[in-house]
Amino acid sequence: MSDSLGEFEQIVLLAILRLGEDAYGASIRAEIEKCTGREPTPGAMYTTLDRLEQKSMLTSRMGEPTAERGGRAKRFFKVTKTGTAAVVRAQRSYQNLLEGLKLIGGAHA
């Protein structure tokens, strides 16, 4: 599978990195909304999380079932070294593209 990242995949990985060890679906969605103003649907989130796990860019583990969740367990996510390296490569690519652009009124042309 490709180790390149789409924009939303990068956003998801960055949100998980920001949240640390306690990153789970709802907290990841909330972090993305807080930081980007974007409100990902649960379907888009979990499809992306599953794809990133298939690409070995993150791992997941099941927490303990809780009464507050009706006996269901949370699925926690952690970015792997492969995922971190992919984010760094993607950000470097963006930086390379931005280099040399002239700023007009504070925005890139």
Language-model segments: residues:
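N-terminal helix-turn-helix DNA-binding core of bacterial DNA-binding proteins
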Residues: 2-44
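Residue-level signal for threonine
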Residues: 6, 80-82
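Alpha-helical residues within the helix-turn-helix
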Residues: 30, 53-54
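Basic amphipathic alpha-helical segments that dock to polyanions
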Residues: 45-52
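Exposed loop/turn and edge beta-strand positions of beta-sandwich/beta-sheet ligand-binding modules
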Residues: 73
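Amphipathic alpha-helical dimerization/coiled-coil segments
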Residues: 82-109
